């Protein structure tokens, strides 16, 4: 499998997709066309999303084709040279992907070796479920089941504490609730500016910040970039 699962598309004060572009370029080396899934877009159109991603990936010489333009999106996925799923609202994304039969189609392609790039919601749907998203459930998908390309859950945009003056639950408290109900599942708190790359049977944390790991019965712990992540495979 070849996966590049990115926490967030854009760092504060930077251009769209600027910080992950070098790694995306290395990951997609030799790829000329990518099939894009824009269904996480809610307050802007799929066409606008496609245009935004195309503007950035054109720097790599990659053409973007969005599944929203296809009469048969699943067929477009089956024929894809590479796949890309953008961020936005995870529930909207999952609902549309399920309706179009894309969850299973994407998993088959990933297992066949097709490169997959996702950020934020696009990383969430690569997991077994979407249960560790940060998003509001604005629509109801058929289920919480997702692509299942990896065996663990990701919480993108992971924050260590709440903003000053905020009295609600921390992200860690919410994840601890999840593992209480799902004791066999690992959860990776993927901080902004970081990503996970899965290639050649190896999982690697890329970025300048550690990743926080959670599992029932264990104290949460930090994993540094370059650490052995084979326990997640």
What are these regions (language model features)?
Residues 31, 80-81, 113, 150:
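Short, well-ordered alpha-helix to beta-strand connector turns
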Residues 43-44, 90-91, 123-126, 195-197:
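Short, active-site-adjacent cap segments at secondary-structure transitions
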Residues 1-30, 41-51, 132, 136-233:
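C-terminal and late-domain segments of enzyme folds
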Residues 79, 99-113:
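Catalytic-core regions built around general acid/base machinery
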Residues 33-36, 41-98:
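Portal/gating segments that form or line small-molecule/metal binding sites
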Residues 84-87, 110-129:
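Catalytic nucleophile loop
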Residues 5, 65-67, 85, 117-119, ...:
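General beta-strand structural signal in soluble alpha/beta enzymes
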């Amino acid at each position: 499998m070849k996966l590049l699962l990115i926490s967030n598309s854009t760092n504060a004060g930077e251009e769209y997709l600027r910080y992950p572009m070098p790694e995306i370029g290395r990951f997609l080396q030799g790829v000329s066309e990518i099939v894009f899934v824009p269904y996480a877009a809610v307050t802007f159109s799929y066409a606008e999303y496609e245009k935004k991603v195309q503007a950035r990936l054109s720097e790599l010489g990659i053409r973007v084709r969005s599944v929203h333009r296809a009469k048969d999106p699943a067929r477009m996925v089956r024929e894809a040279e590479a796949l890309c799923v953008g961020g936005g609202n995870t529930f909207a994304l999952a609902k549309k992907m399920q309706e179009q039969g894309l969850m299973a189609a994407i998993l088959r392609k990933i297992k066949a070796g097709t490169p997959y790039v996702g950020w934020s919601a696009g990383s969430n749907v690569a997991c077994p479920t979407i249960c560790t998203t940060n998003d509001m459930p604005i629509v109801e998908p058929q289920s919480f089941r997702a692509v299942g390309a990896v065996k663990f859950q990701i919480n993108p945009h992971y924050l260590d504490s709440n903003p000053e003056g905020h009295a609600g639950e921390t992200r860690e408290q919410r994840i601890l609730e999840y593992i209480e109900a799902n004791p066999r599942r690992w959860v990776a708190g993927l901080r902004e500016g970081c990503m996970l790359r899965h290639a050649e049977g190896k999982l690697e944390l890329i970025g300048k910040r550690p990743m926080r790991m959670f599992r029932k019965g264990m104290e949460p712990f930090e994993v540094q970039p370059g650490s052995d992540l084979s326990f997640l495979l």
